[in-house]
């Protein structure tokens, strides 16, 4: 009997082990044949996959492993051959982007084929007004990227940026700006970190030029070590990513240490790089002075139509320009400075296009054809004899145009020549530089857009862990998307990591910062949120230690903080509460019903006022009508305001003195005990 039980247990263990193994047996001939054909085509259909999969029940983890394995082989799983699109890159993302981390490993799927079919099933095409569903549907239409796809897009981003930088380096405006920035650095009005990208410059050429990638085993080991470290931290703190108050994924004390280290490292890098950068800027300034002389000479010759530079001068011009481009590229300028240079270039180009557009429209108004105008104008922007040459043209409209609009044409061309003088190069050269910068910027922007759209699933998988913390799900997604875009800008594919590994931190940081900054009805600065988190965590720890809530004095002693600061933080940490909050089990009353209204009249005071009004009316009615009216007008009883003797006298067509006498007589009557007794009780109360 014992032997039988032992055999059953062994069989059960064997089944469990089999269920955790891979779905595809790579030693099977049918599987080998299917994979070989799929690699050749780049995809495999669901029917072909189901034919080689086992029919027994499998776990969701096995399904995910199989999909990841096929993706790593470069095989895309599709519904059928008609659904295959040309050029689709069927990669898989990491665990964050691919599936729900909360799913249980032991949960059983109906079968391997059915589960895979369900995993690839598309969203229904029925209409919906739910913005979340609409967003998810649009997001799902974008294919995931393989590692090779990510690297290809990252290279396109880098190439576009290099093209843009190369264009900027050919513009004299860039060198003028660099000389100004050098002077600001010398004067101490600008920090080095505001001009160059410290981290990129500090890492040196080896970080950029290293073509080799880290081994997958090393990357996987680093990832597992980071996960173990995170689990240990959570177990030690007894909390999830964020405290109850809402804040960062790291404990505040660790964040403060990280920030201090970051600040120190930035200062250290700045101090170390400053001599090298200043030397480069000095070289740029000296070289540009030599180049500027040749540029001015070239522009003057074009304006005077006296020829061009000699061949020796042209060679020298090219050598100086190459030296400047090499020096500028070695600086790794800050992105904000690059944007400022591009904006300056585009602003001048906008003014140029406006002037050229005015000239073209003016010519077309005299019947000059557009193609004819462009043929005569392009390349002769700075030719001083252009007016004379177009006046001799026999084509329709040219003579009338040159004769009638002589003054206007000269004014417009003078503005164009001023732009050439401002840029230091010819108009055709300036236009070529602008097109080069625009091309690089456009290519980089398109590639960044593709990278962002392909990783929107990663934002969803991270954002869903931060729901019910004060922000709507769509707001969390959009904040995460902002972090994703920052990650795309800063991603360095040469380090060998997948983009999702790098982007996760940026996305989580953007989401947690937004929760800390926006989740509360009354905004609290992020640095104060971190202090609140620290106090809440310490308070929870002390509650376990001493068995009661700690006092502010105990918290101040434990945290080594001033008592007043602890009290202030505890006061700030209180959450607003709605006046409509139900009170009691029956929920027929609300919190607002129990709050005193300081401006409202008390019921007893209202009763006294009503009784006084009624008694005063009865007492005044015992006087003559004339006396009653005089008293009412003089003291404003039952009226909006009181009246002077003069105003009352005008009403009765008598003198002020007569009104005073009537008033005095009426007051004497009121002092009689029969009347005053009725009013005295109000005076006493």
Swiss-Prot record:
Gene Ontology biological-process annotations: DNA-templated transcription initiation
Annotated GO MF terms: DNA binding; sigma factor activity
Domain of life according to the entry: Bacteria
Region (Disordered): 1-26, 83-132, 206-263
Gene3D superfamilies in alphabetical order: RNA Polymerase Primary Sigma Factor, Sigma-70 factor, region 1.1, Winged helix-like DNA-binding domain superfamily/Winged helix DNA-binding domain
Pfam assignment, any one: Sigma70_r3
Subcellular location: Cytoplasm
Residue window of motif Interaction with polymerase core subunit RpoC: 475-478
Region described as Sigma-70 factor domain-2: spans on this chain: 451-521
Region called Sigma-70 factor domain-3, residue ranges: 530-606
CC per GO annotation: cytoplasm
Subunit architecture: Interacts transiently with the RNA polymerase catalytic core.
Family recorded in the similarity comment: Belongs to the sigma-70 factor family. RpoD/SigA subfamily.
Protein name in UniProt: RNA polymerase sigma factor RpoD
Gene name in the database record: rpoD
């Amino acid at each position: 009997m014992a032997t039988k039980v032992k055999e059953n247990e062994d069989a059960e263990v064997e089944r469990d082990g089999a269920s955790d193994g891979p779905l595809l047996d790579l030693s099977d001939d049918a599987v080998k044949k299917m994979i070989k054909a799929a690699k050749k085509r780049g995809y495999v259909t669901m029917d072909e996959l189901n034919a080689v999969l086992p029919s027994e029940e499998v776990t969701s983890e096995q399904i995910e492993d199989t999909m990841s394995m096929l993706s790593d082989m470069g095989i895309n799983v599709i519904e059928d051959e008609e659904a295959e699109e040309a050029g689709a890159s069927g990669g898989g993302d990491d665990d964050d982007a691919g599936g729900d981390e909360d799913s249980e490993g032991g949960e059983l799927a109906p079968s391997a084929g059915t589960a895979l079919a369900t995993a690839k099933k598309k969203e229904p095409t029925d209409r919906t007004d739910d913005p979340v569903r609409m967003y998810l549907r649009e997001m799902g239409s974008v294919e995931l990227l393989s590692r090779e796809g990510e690297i290809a897009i990252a290279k396109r981003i880098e190439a576009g940026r290099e093209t843009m930088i190369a264009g900027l380096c050919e513009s004299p405006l860039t060198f003028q700006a660099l000389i100004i920035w050098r002077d600001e650095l010398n004067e101490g009005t600008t920090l080095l970190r505001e001009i160059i990208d410290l981290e990129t410059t500090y890492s040196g050429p080896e970080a950029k030029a290293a073509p080799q990638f880290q081994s997958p085993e090393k990357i996987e080991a680093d990832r597992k070590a980071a996960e173990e470290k995170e689990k240990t931290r959570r177990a030690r703190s007894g909390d999830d990513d964020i405290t109850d108050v809402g804040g960062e994924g790291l404990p505040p004390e660790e964040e403060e240490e990280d920030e201090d280290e970051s600040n120190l490292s930035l200062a250290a890098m700045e101090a170390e790089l400053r001599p090298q950068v200043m030397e480069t800027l000095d070289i740029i300034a000296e070289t540009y002075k030599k180049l500027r002389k040749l540029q001015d000479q070239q522009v003057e010759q074009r304006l005077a139509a006296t020829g061009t530079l000699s061949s020796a001068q042209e060679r020298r011009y090219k050598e100086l320009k190459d030296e400047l481009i090499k020096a500028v590229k070695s600086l790794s300028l800050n992105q904000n400075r690059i944007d400022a240079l591009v904006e300056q270039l585009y602003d001048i180009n906008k003014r140029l296009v406006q002037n050229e557009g005015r000239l073209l429209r003016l010519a077309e108004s005299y019947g000059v054809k557009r193609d004819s105008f462009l043929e005569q104008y392009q390349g002769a922007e700075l030719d001083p004899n252009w007016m004379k040459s177009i006046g001799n043209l026999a084509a329709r409209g040219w003579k009338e145009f040159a004769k009638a609009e002589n003054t206007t044409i000269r004014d417009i061309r003078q503005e164009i020549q001023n732009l050439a003088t401002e840029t230091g190069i010819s108009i055709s050269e300036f236009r070529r530089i602008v097109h080069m910068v625009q091309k690089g910027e456009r290519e980089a922007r398109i590639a960044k857009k593709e990278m962002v759209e392909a990783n929107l699933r990663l934002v969803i998988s991270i954002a869903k862990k931060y729901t019910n913390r004060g922000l709507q799900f769509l707001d969390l997604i959009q904040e995460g998307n902002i972090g994703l875009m920052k990650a795309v800008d800063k991603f360095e594919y040469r380090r060998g990591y997948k983009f999702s590994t790098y982007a996760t931190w940026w996305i989580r940081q953007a989401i947690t910062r937004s929760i800390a900054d926006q989740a509360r009805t009354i905004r609290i600065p992020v640095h104060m949120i971190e202090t609140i988190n620290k106090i809440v965590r310490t308070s929870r720890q002390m509650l376990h230690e001493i068995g009661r809530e700690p006092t502010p004095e105990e918290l101040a002693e434990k945290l080594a903080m001033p008592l007043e600061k602890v009290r202030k933080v505890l006061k700030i940490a209180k959450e607003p509460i709605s006046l409509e909050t139900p009170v009691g089990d029956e929920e027929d009353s609300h919190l607002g019903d129990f709050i005193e209204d300081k401006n409202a009249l008390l019921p007893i005071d209202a009763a006294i006022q009503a009784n006084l009004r009624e008694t005063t009316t009865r007492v005044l009615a015992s006087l003559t009508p004339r006396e009653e009216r005089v008293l009412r007008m003089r003291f404003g009883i039952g009226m909006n305001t009181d009246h002077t003797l003069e105003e009352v006298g005008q009403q009765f067509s008598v003198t002020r003195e007569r009104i005073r006498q009537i008033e005095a007589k009426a007051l004497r009557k009121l002092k009689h005990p029969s009347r005053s007794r009725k009013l005295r009780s109000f005076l006493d109360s």
